[in-house]
Amino acid sequence: MSVKDIDIVIDGYPKEVLKFLEKNKIPIKNKFLNYGVFFLKFDEIDCNLTCLREDYGHDGRHSKVIFSKNLNADSKRRDLTINALYLNLEGQIIDFCNGYHDIMNSNLIFIGDYKKKCLEDYLRIVRYIRFCSIFKNPFIPKEYKIFFIENSNLLKKIPKNKLLDELKKIFVNKYFYNSIELIKFLNLENYLLNE
């Protein structure tokens, strides 16, 4: 499997990072300065460059941000433990949330309170379903399934283009059938597969 996209975090503030990118003539595909996010492209690899930050004031899709220099705080804003792994320039893994252990054991675990994480951003429910497609036998806690079923109406609030993007990503993964089976088990076909 070849890498098609890379996420990079940087301990700089958005205007500083923008200045650096422009000074070094690094092409920027898109940017969201309010969130400290820059989309770059190198050859065939998409690169998301994000300033370290903490999120607050969530409304189910968006949040307000405070830029930070704290990698640990940045990790806590992420959805799943497997998405909170960092690799420094020396090649050392930095893991504040037990993500490496969870990858090695096919565990899909939210960071902190799973209900709170999903209510902060409803798309996290769909992302969770998508991440089931990267593991042969993903471990999915029973309480997550119950919560997803009880809160399936939240999926109606997600823009269709965001749902479609996540669904497309499911089908490029080896174990896409895990996600499809979970969608059916959760009875979410009407919310997701008819889009």
Question: Model-derived features: where do they sit?
Answer:
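Catalytic cores of the polymerase beta-like nucleotidyltransferase superfamily
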Residues: M1-E195
